[in-house]
Swiss-Prot record:
Source species taxonomy: Bacteria, Bacillati, Actinomycetota, Actinomycetes, Mycobacteriales
Gene: uppP
Membrane topology: Multi-pass membrane protein
Residues spanning the membrane: 84-104, 115-135, 188-208, 222-242, 250-270
Protein name: Undecaprenyl-diphosphatase
Annotated organism of origin: Mycobacterium bovis (strain ATCC BAA-935 / AF2122/97)
Predominant localisation class: membrane
Length: 276
C-alpha cells in the first residue's frame, strides 16, 4: 500500500465513519475505483481506531459521567439514575454485534465485501433510512429510554457488519422507528459503537499487516498515519453531524446514498469497475 493510498483511504474513513453513508462501503468503493484493489476489512477496522478515539474524546464528559453513575449505582441503589441505566443499555446493546461479529468474521473479510453487495446495500438501506425519518415521531427523550430500546438498537447495529449499510445509519434509523428524537438516536448509537469498534480494531490489528484475504497491506507507520488522519477528520465529522441533525433531517443523506449507489451500479453493470 502506497502513502497516497493510505492518505486517501484514511480521509474517506474519517469523513464518512459517523455519517449515515457507510464508511466501509466508501472505503471499498474508493479503493476499487482509484487503486483497483480492496483496502480490506482489517485496514478498515484498524483505521476505525482513529475515529473511535475521536468519538471517545467528543463524548468524554458523557462517558465519565455515565461510568461514574454506573459504578455508584452498583454500590448504592439510591444512585441508580438515568446515567446508571444508560450504562447498562450500552452494555446490553453491544452484545448482539459482538456475538455476530465473531461468528461471521470470515464472511465480513471476504464475500460481503463484493462491490455488488456493498452498492446494493447502499441503495436499499436508503429506503430504510427514509422510512424511519418519515414515520419517526421523535417524541421520546433520554429519560424514557428503556432496555428494550437498547436491544433493538443493538440488533440494528449488527447490520453495520455488511459494508454499505452504515453503523450510524442503522442505529439512528432504529432509534427513529422507536420514537426517539433524532439527536438522541445519534448520540446513543455513537455510545453503543464505542466498545464494538474498539474491540474490532484491536482484534484486526495483526491482519492489517498480513491480510488473510487479498486486501492491501499496510506498514506500521502507515497504519499510524491512517489512524491520525481518521481521528482528526472523524472528530470534525461527529461534531458537524450532531449539529446538523438538530435542524435538518436524514433525507439529505438518503439522496446522497442513492446518487452514489446508482452511479456505482452503472459502473459495475458496464464493467467499468470490477466487483471483486
Amino acid at each position: 500500500m502506497s502513502w497516497w493510498q493510505v492518505i486517501v483511504l484514511a480521509a474517506a474513513q474519517g469523513l464518512t465513519e459517523f455519517l449515515p453513508v457507510s464508511s466501509s462501503g466508501h472505503l471499498a468503493i474508493v479503493s476499487r475505483i482509484f487503486f483497483s484493489g480492496d483496502a480490506g476489512a482489517s485496514f478498515t477496522a484498524v483505521s476505525q481506531l482513529g475515529t473511535e478515539a475521536a468519538v471517545v474524546i467528543y463524548f468524554a464528559r458523557d462517558i465519565v459521567r455515565i461510568l461514574s453513575a454506573w459504578v455508584h449505582g452498583l454500590v448504592v441503589k439510591a444512585h441508580r439514575n438515568t446515567d446508571y441505566r444508560l450504562g447498562w443499555y450500552v452494555i446490553i446493546g453491544t452484545i448482539p454485534i459482538c456475538i455476530l461479529g465473531l461468528f461471521f468474521k470470515d464472511d465480513i473479510r471476504s464475500g460481503v465485501r463484493n462491490l455488488w453487495v456493498v452498492v446494493t446495500a447502499l441503495v436499499v438501506f436508503s429506503g430504510v433510512i427514509a422510512l424511519a425519518e418519515y414515520v419517526g415521531r421523535q417524541s421520546r427523550h433520554i429519560e424514557r429510554l428503556t432496555w428494550r430500546d437498547a436491544v433493538v438498537v443493538g440488533i440494528a447495529q449488527t447490520l453495520a457488519l455488511v459494508p454499505g449499510v452504515s453503523r450510524s445509519g442503522s442505529t439512528i434509523s432504529a432509534g427513529l422507528f422507536l420514537g426517539l428524537d433524532r439527536e438522541l438516536a445519534a448520540r446513543f448509537g455513537f455510545l453503543l459503537a464505542i466498545p464494538a469498534v474498539f474491540a474490532s480494531g484491536l482484534f484486526s490489528l495483526p491482519d492489517a499487516f498480513h491480510p488473510v484475504t487479498e486486501g492491501m497491506s499496510a506498514t506500521g507507520p502507515q497504519l499510524l498515519v491512517a489512524t491520525l488522519i481518521a481521528f482528526v477528520l472523524g472528530l470534525t465529522a461527529v461534531a458537524w453531524l450532531l449539529r446538523f441533525l438538530v435542524r435538518h433531517n436524514m433525507y439529505w443523506f438518503v439522496g446522497y446514498r442513492v446518487l452514489v449507489g446508482t452511479g456505482m451500479l452503472v459502473l459495475l453493470a458496464t464493467g467499468t469497475v470490477a466487483a471483486t
